[in-house]
Amino acid sequence: MSPFSERLRALRLRYGVRQKDLAEAMGFEQSYVSALELGIKGPPSRDFVDRLARYLRLSADELAGLLSELEASRRHYTIPQTASSDAYRLCGELWRELDLLSDAQIRVMRQLIETWRRGPVKLGDRPVLGRVMRKDKEGTEM
């Protein structure tokens, strides 16, 4: 299930709206709303999101969260022409292994990316990913 699917279902349930009523009010089929919630259909158009926001009277924060999940749910990406051959290989390897990765492995990769996003890691820095590293025995008094 995509992040958008999860958010759509959560919003619909929070506002107490049936799929049929939501779809009808927005001008869509109930089967389309169901397919979106199940992740069978790819992310919808911005028009769908705007109609949903108007119908549910979403707050600015709720709409921003929904748009963030819409972006996170993209299924197709284009590798930039300026990417290195290693970047192409990495994308291909990740694509081939995607269905085989556990949730824990995905979390570790996302934590790594977040670490890089925060800034360059200096030589000797050891980022901690999900656990505390023990001090070396050297330098400890006995």
Question: How should these model regions be labeled?
Answer:
Residues M1-R14, R107-V108, E141:
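A short, Lys/Arg-rich alpha-helix, primarily the initiator
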Residues G27-P43, R51:
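Recognition helix of helix-turn-helix/homeodomain-like DNA-binding domains
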Residues E71-E141:
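Interfacial/linker helices and their anchor residues that mediate assembly or domain coupling
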Residues R12, A23, A53:
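The alpha-helix within a helix-turn-helix
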Residues R9, K20, D50:
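Residues within the helices of the helix-turn-helix
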